């Protein structure tokens, strides 16, 4: 005969397991954050975002990022463009090179979504 588990008192669970978020996302918040998460859903783009954000000086160009991947420069540029179009990266053209830096506003939106108190 299967053994049943005891039910927990919902009032008592708040002490051991605080909610992950103060309140659910509104429709507008979900629509704002969804494109950011969609852009980050690719492992290459997630890693590119991490590399740019942690790069010395807070910015990097394709020439700085190519050695970290077994991908062609045009492919890396495409992924950087997707991140830029989603608002995760800002860019600045200097001569023939385009330098990318993480958008602090987009990162703050993501941090608020996951409840990171540092941002």
Question: Which residue stretches match the model-derived regions?
Answer:
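Alpha-helical residues within the helix-turn-helix
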Residues: 67, 78, 84-85
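Residue-level signal for well-ordered alpha-helical positions
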Residues: 52, 113-114
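Short, Lys/Arg-enriched C-terminal cap helix and immediately downstream tail that follows
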Residues: 87-90, 95-96, 111-113
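Recognition helix of helix-turn-helix DNA-binding domains
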Residues: 74-75, 80-81, 98
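A common structural junction motif
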Residues: 118-119
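N-terminal leader segment of winged-helix/HTH proteins
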Residues: 1-40, 86
């Amino acid at each position: 005969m299967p053994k049943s588990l005891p039910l927990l008192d919902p009032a008592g669970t708040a002490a051991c397991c605080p909610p992950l978020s103060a309140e659910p996302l509104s429709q507008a918040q979900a629509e704002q954050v969804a494109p950011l998460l969609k852009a980050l859903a690719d492992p290459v783009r997630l890693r590119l975002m991490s590399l740019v954000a942690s790069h010395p000086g807070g910015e990097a160009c394709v020439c700085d990022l190519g050695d970290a991947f077994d991908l062609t420069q045009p492919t890396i540029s495409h992924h950087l463009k997707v991140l830029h179009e989603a608002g995760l990266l800002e860019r600045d053209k200097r001569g023939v090179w385009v330098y990318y830096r993480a958008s602090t506003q987009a990162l703050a939106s993501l941090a608020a979504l996951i409840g990171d108190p540092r941002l």
